[in-house]
UniProtKB/Swiss-Prot annotation:
Entry keywords, A to Z: Nucleotidyltransferase, RNA-directed RNA polymerase, Transferase
GO process annotations (BP): DNA-templated transcription
Molecular functions (GO terms): RNA binding; RNA-directed RNA polymerase activity
Species: Broad bean mottle virus
Protein name in UniProt: RNA-directed RNA polymerase 2a
Amino acid sequence: MSKFVAADEYIVPSFQWLLGPTSSQVESFDSSVAGWIKRYEDESKRPESTVDGSCESFVLAVKPVMIGGQCEPAYDQAKWAETCLNVTNLASGLTGVRLIPLPEMARMIYLDEEDSFVDESEVDDWYPEDTSDGFEYLSADGSDYHQNSEPEEEVLDKSNGTLESEEARHETDVKSICSFRDIPVETTMGHRYLALSEEFASIEVDYQVSSIVTPLNKGSIYMTLDVHEETHPKSGIQDKASIERLEAAGHNALKTHAYFDDSYYEGFEESADFSSDFQRLKIKQSHVDWYKDPDKFFEPVLNFGASSRRVGSQKTVLTALKKRNADVPELSDVVDATEVPICLRQSYLNIYGADCLFESFNIMAKGLDYHKRWKSHKELQGVTLLCETNLQRYQHMIKSDVKPTVTDTLHVERDVPATITFHGKGVTSCFSPFFTACFEKFSLALRESIYVPIGKISSLELKSKALNNKFFLEADLSKFDKSQGELHLEFQRLILINLGFPVPLTNWWCDFHRSILSRWTLRPGVSIPLLSKTNRGCFHLLWEHFSDNAMMAYCFDMSTAELAMFSGDDSLVICGSKPEFDPGVFQSLFNMEVKVMDPSLPYICSKFLLESEFGDVFSVPDPMREIQRLQKRKIPKDVQVLRADFDSFCDRMKFLDRLSELSLSVLCRLTALKYCKPGIEGDVRAWLSGFAYYRENFLRYSECYVTDGIHCYRRVDPMSRFKPIDKFQRSDKEWFHDWRNNEFPKKPIDKMARMFGAYKGPVNNDRVERKAKYKVNAAMHDPFALAYERRYVQELELKNDKGNCSVLRE
């Protein structure tokens, strides 16, 4: 029960009567207030008011009146009690200031009146000021001094009875005003503590220098500075990178990913029963051993990304096909297929884009030129003739490198690998050059506000494009391949014809894809019929852009977009006002699931878009994805493969040179918003510092993987010889990194080596020396050969000059 509310007036806590039915309670409050008002109608009977939070104190301080049976102003028990509490705390904190009475302060706060709490009725602007020069001024003639002045007796009579009160009042005012007008100065530890009494130790005994620690035996101090220290000081930003810090940041950001081992779930899946819902399915004996030797791949040191390497066994393939290629929903609405290509042309193509593929001869000639280029630097082995191949049969494949998840659902759900339905390279090489030529022609006809990152050097860097104060629409067609059907094949045919692609070639392409597609997977032994799939070489990318652009233009007004980016199944629309887009309409019309990110951020192709200080847009890879890519389990134990992965890592980390402190803060905030994790901004900074550290050289990058000393040169701890341990019983903890030592220990360093014999790894000093000498000789061979050739040419020129001179003499 509150100390500011009397026991007989306390009914229920404020938060209860505010939420519940309060009619009867309000009437009781009004009746109690009316009783107190009637009791103190006579001003002479009013006692001194207090601020104890009771109804009586409210009547005495606020002085309400009864109008029509209701109290004005209304009496709020909880608000009045809280007001009294605040006034009491305020008065206790301002001890050196003369304030107005507490009931008056409570009345002003309760009625929300603006006025000062300081009592200014008796405070004037007088402030004591010492203007003397150190001596008292007296006139040379005393009679002149008293000539124009009043008699001393009259002055004393005028000030009689008031002098003492004035002096007391001024003394009080000076103390109160001086407490406010002290000039703030910097304080030290000497200002904070004042020693009151102390007693030093005796110095009769000769102390050693090392033993004199605290000569003050007894003392008491008094704290004079009334300042509360911060109990939890904020730590500065640390940029030092280490494996331990990166792993700690990863465990904080991804709660369910810590030390996740997928091998248990792999064995559980292979040993459990499997139920299939396919209508038509062919299965034969599988030739895949689901348990592969993991020692053939590098083991990452970090373990929070849940990056698993899947084996394409029969049950894994069936699980992936069931998740990715089955259970396609039916259409729930009707759409005019002929309007879709018209929207594509009107929304994305410029005035010169009408019939951009109409000149079919030029398209075919360009495609033939692409084919000749491919043939000039590729062998023709494996290239087949289309007339001798059944194009209705495809191959199925699953991605063994599973894309790691970023949601906290790893403890309840296991990722399913993605599937790919494709033609072989020999088949796609026959028609991909023609569709490449179509894509080139189509990209040249796009409007300036439409951007499609294509080509060998595909970049998301844009000049003079602003992102600040913009609205974003981030849409992802995550189930693009799964949701395709007859309708999308008709979209494809109409779009190609509308753009001017040859009609006979278009009809031929679409007709044989309407048939059932079936193909045995080579090793798992699974065959399943599929309908209208588009994972077929270059045209898959072309059709993804066509369909994504056309369906977005049909459901969204692209005229409101200042900039639109499309890359496969990812799309990003930048608008000056808030975009209006209904995913339900999109799904009901096109039988395709579209996922609109909330909140929508400048994010496309797993990259964030940031605006530089000069008004340009540059892309930054997702830090969450990049830290998970440092834990890949599909890198074979080969130096060249690991170095190639390091080169790819350095190429992706080029954005670090462009990050300012402002861009770094924005990137951390965008990452936290993207994954709805407000507490990972510090973790993102730790990851970025790790990226900058490990991209410096290959030896640092090798720390992220267990390389068994192949790339991390080590030497013995020099203090180990003082320890009573046999040199043949050293453990891994007694070795530390030393990049200047180029010799790996030849003695066994762990338990397994002592059990199975001496360490015999891929590192052999003799072989390394021979290989190094061979590289040096090979590097020196070319310069020597060029030097000898140049000397031979000079000798020939000299002989030729001598012959010419002899001819001239004759």
